[in-house]
């Protein structure tokens, strides 16, 4: 997803171990990548390891600059609301996404995907003029977090009601899809067994 950031990301590839140590390979990769990408660790895994399917959970964080607070240095890494947001409504609606729900209204579907997924936890926090919305689960659909945040922003702008979100999560109706901007989204953590 273009402009989405990752603080944690796993990549699987094969190489001839006898030619390079893990430390040498890490050094070479870090010199090859742009400064925005940095290899922090190399771990040997089974040949059939899949970074996408073998994880036990992923945590996404969406950054929003609080209304009335603009930090230009973070403008490419966060969402800046263009109108008033009712923060209390966002706090109220965020826990609605926890649990097992039908998320087809919160995704761009690409074929025969399982849209009945579980969000293990959500959280809201504020720090230094920033709002942090976190979503933790084993699997997410394409653009799911951006559509969930879009629904929260729509609710915070009084464009939709709580029942609209609940009906969409129950698969009863298609929510008017509003996809949040990509630059506020971070893949914050991936956990493996």
Please tell me what each predicted stretch does.
Residues 2-193:
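Structured-RNA-binding interfaces characteristic of tRNA pseudouridine synthases
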